[in-house]
């Protein structure tokens, strides 16, 4: 779809979100809602580009947040349901959290006991409360993303679950997945059903958390629908899902420019973007993002290592090859850069943040925001 966008006219670097691709994802998610009656909400920890919230709000039921600021953003910019979960809440923020949120999920019974009287006495609206459970079952292989690894701080395990403290609790929440298919969810639900079923039957809702790659091409949507309906019908409860990546998967790009080409045993292209600053998951995961019209390092004739303009020696994006030699001034386009990019980027070395750009059929290219020195200075 980028063929009708003139990359030369875009600021560099920039995050570019194509609303046509975003809408395609939202339509698929809405199909799941219609087939199951489940409620799907956006996990803003993955994607908080609020200029797209009016579009997202046409399809999804609201947002789920991990902090006061995310909750406020969802409340102000989408204006639908606002859920929140945190391993622990700050007392000096909790009154404001209640202002913005209609669902508050607690990580422990300690936190629930600390705040339940405040929630009960809150008069402006009814706030539903939940407890996060730790099913102690996850198929995530990377520990940094696995909330069920040994001695995890996330959620209440069966051994520590206290049924006497459930009075006033409306639902249970679990989040054990990361970029996974519905067969993983089906196996997880068997564990949750077996170990926590006697508590679920007392609830109004069950939240399946995030990590569901629903909009990926190979995702088995029928198994997802069957799994949702199984729990929904068995316990006569509402079901929530809170994907982040799936909402904006493959709908965004990072456009950058080649600044220099040097040789040191191989061709090295220095670009005006940074893995450390602009796409930190590349180093954290790690993974190698795809570039449009590129191949693996030995696939085409002209091979390059792409590096950043920072002082970090390991700020390497990856090794690529191209059918034609790169030149200074060439534009390169990284794929799938809407998620966990804008929400995690930083100004290490004083490297400027990429501009934020949106494309829609109605308005074409819109430059949503450009950053500069004051954005860097104001954080320090």
PLM feature segments, named:
Residues 38-205, 227:
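Active-site-proximal beta-alpha core segment in soluble small-molecule metabolic enzymes
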Residues 5-10, 170-175, 209:
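A short small-residue
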Residues 137-139, 178, 214, 247, ...:
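Feature marks short, surface-exposed loop/turn motifs that line or immediately flank catalytic pockets
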Residues 2-79, 85-88, 274, 322-335, ...:
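N-terminal capping/small domains of soluble enzymes
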Residues 43, 176-177, 206-215, 243-245:
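Glycine-rich beta-strand-to-loop/alpha-helix junction loops that act as flexible
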Residues 227, 238, 243-380:
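Charged (often Lys/Glu-rich) extended helix/loop segments that serve as interaction or gating elements
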Residues 186-191, 220-226, 256, 321:
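Charged helix-capping and loop-helix junction motifs
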């Amino acid at each position: 779809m980028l063929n009708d966008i003139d990359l030369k006219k875009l600021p560099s670097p920039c995050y570019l979100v194509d609303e046509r691709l975003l809408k395609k994802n939202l339509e698929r998610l809405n199909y799941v809602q219609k087939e199951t009656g489940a409620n799907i909400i956006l996990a803003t920890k993955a994607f908080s580009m609020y200029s797209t919230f009016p579009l997202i709000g046409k399809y999804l039921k609201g947002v789920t947040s991990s902090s006061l600021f995310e909750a406020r953003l969802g409340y102000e910019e989408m204006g639908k349901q606002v859920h929140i979960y945190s391993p622990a809440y700050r007392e000096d923020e909790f009154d404001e959290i209640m202002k913005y949120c209609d669902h508050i999920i607690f990580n422990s019974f300690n936190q629930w006991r600390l705040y339940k009287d405040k929630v009960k006495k809150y008069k402006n609206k009814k706030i539903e409360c939940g407890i996060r459970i730790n099913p102690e079952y996850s198929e995530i292989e990377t520990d940094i993303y696995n909330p069920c690894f040994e001695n995890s701080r996330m959620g209440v395990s069966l051994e520590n679950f206290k049924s006497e403290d459930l009075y006033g609790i409306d639902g249970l929440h679990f989040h054990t997945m990361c970029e996974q298919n519905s067969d993983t969810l089906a196996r997880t639900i068997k564990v949750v059903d077996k170990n926590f079923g006697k508590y679920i039957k007392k609830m109004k809702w069950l939240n399946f958390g995030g990590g569901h790659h629903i909009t990926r091409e190979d995702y088995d949507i029928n198994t997802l629908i069957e799994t949702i309906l199984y729990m929904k019908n068995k316990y006569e409860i509402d079901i929530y899902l809170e994907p982040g990546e799936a909402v904006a998967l493959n709908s965004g790009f990072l456009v950058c420019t080649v600044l220099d080409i040097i040789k040191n045993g191989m061709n090295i292209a220095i670009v005006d973007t940074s893995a450390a600053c602009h796409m930190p998951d590349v180093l954290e995961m790690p993974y190698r993002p795809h570039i449009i019209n590129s191949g693996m390092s030995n696939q085409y004739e002209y091979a390059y290592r792409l590096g950043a303009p920072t002082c970090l020696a390991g700020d390497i994006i990856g090794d690529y090859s191209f059918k034609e030699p790169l030149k200074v001034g060439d534009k390169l386009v990284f794929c799938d850069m809407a998620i966990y990019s804008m929400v995690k980027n930083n100004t290490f070395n004083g490297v400027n943040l990429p501009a934020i750009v949106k494309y829609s059929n109605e308005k074409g290219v819109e430059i949503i925001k450009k950053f500069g020195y004051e954005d860097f200075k104001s954080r320090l």
